[in-house]
């Protein structure tokens, strides 16, 4: 999950510039995504998440472990592993954009809180993209127990990182 976990904060850190929706509105008159979703954020977030995954692949190939736990293996070979890592990183940001689209439809402004949805949108996006490109890998690695753990721990991690982002001035709201 590290590629997914890291793509969002790095998109916020390195984002800015031209919005993905180009300032356009949907048929309801509201912005499609809003100013918070930019090309620079999208590509830098995917890149940073992908690099984090590549580091994990490298560490795993060398038998690295943390507290007796082996690093994840993202696929049977490097090509498959790179595809999974890219799916995790990009799926996270597309999940976040999907959520933003629906928040705009609900009339919620940029930064408005939508509890649990704000914390799990990128997880769902990462899982969907990963399942689409590597269903066998996904099913064998994201067991019910792992998924439940991710669903429980992610909101806590999300809140912590958002508070840090708020304190250092990267985010305008601490959620």
UniProtKB/Swiss-Prot annotation:
Catalytic activity, as annotated: 2,3-bis-O-(geranylgeranyl)-sn-glycerol 1-phosphate + CTP + H(+) = CDP-2,3-bis-O-(geranylgeranyl)-sn-glycerol + diphosphate
InterPro entries recorded: CarS, CarS_archaea
In terms of domain of life, where is this protein from? Answer: Archaea
- Pathways involved: Membrane lipid metabolism; glycerophospholipid metabolism
State the compartments where it is located.
Cell membrane
Name its co-factor(s): Mg(2+)
Query: Transmembrane ranges?
Result: 41-61, 82-102, 122-142, 150-170
Q: Mind listing the GO biological process terms from this record?
A: glycerophospholipid biosynthetic process
Q: Which GO terms describe its cellular component?
A: plasma membrane
Q: Extract the GO molecular function terms from the UniProt entry.
A: CDP-2,3-bis-(O-geranylgeranyl)-sn-glycerol synthase activity
Q: Which UniProt keywords apply?
A: Cell membrane, Lipid biosynthesis, Lipid metabolism, Magnesium, Membrane, Phospholipid biosynthesis, Phospholipid metabolism, Transferase, Transmembrane, Transmembrane helix
> How does the record say this protein sits in the membrane?
Multi-pass membrane protein
According to its UniProt record, the EC number is: 2.7.7.67
Q: What does this protein do?
A: Catalyzes the formation of CDP-2,3-bis-(O-geranylgeranyl)-sn-glycerol (CDP-archaeol) from 2,3-bis-(O-geranylgeranyl)-sn-glycerol 1-phosphate (DGGGP) and CTP. This reaction is the third ether-bond-formation step in the biosynthesis of archaeal membrane lipids.
User: What protein family does this chain belong to?
Assistant: Belongs to the CDP-archaeol synthase family.
Protein's recorded name: CDP-archaeol synthase
What species is given as this protein's source? Methanosarcina barkeri (strain Fusaro / DSM 804)
Which gene is annotated as encoding this protein in its UniProt record? carS
């Amino acid at each position: 999950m590290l590629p997914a976990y890291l793509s969002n904060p790095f998109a916020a850190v390195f984002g800015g510039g031209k919005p993905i929706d180009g300032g356009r509105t949907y048929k309801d008159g509201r912005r499609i995504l809003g100013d918070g979703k930019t090309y620079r954020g999208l590509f830098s977030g995917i890149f940073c998440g992908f690099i984090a995954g590549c580091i994990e692949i490298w560490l795993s190939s060398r038998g690295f472990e943390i507290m007796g736990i082996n690093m994840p293996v993202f696929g049977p070979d490097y090509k498959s592993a790179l595809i999974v890592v890219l799916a995790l990183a990009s799926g996270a940001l597309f999940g976040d954009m999907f959520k933003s689209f629906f928040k705009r439809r609900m009339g919620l402004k940029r930064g408005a809180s939508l509890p649990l949805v704000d914390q799990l949108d990128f997880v769902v996006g990462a899982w969907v993209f990963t399942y689409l490109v590597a269903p066998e890998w996904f099913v064998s690695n994201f067991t019910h127990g792992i998924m439940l753990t991710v669903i429980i721990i992610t909101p806590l991690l999300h809140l912590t990182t958002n508070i840090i982002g708020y304190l250092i001035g990267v985010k305008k709201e601490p959620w």
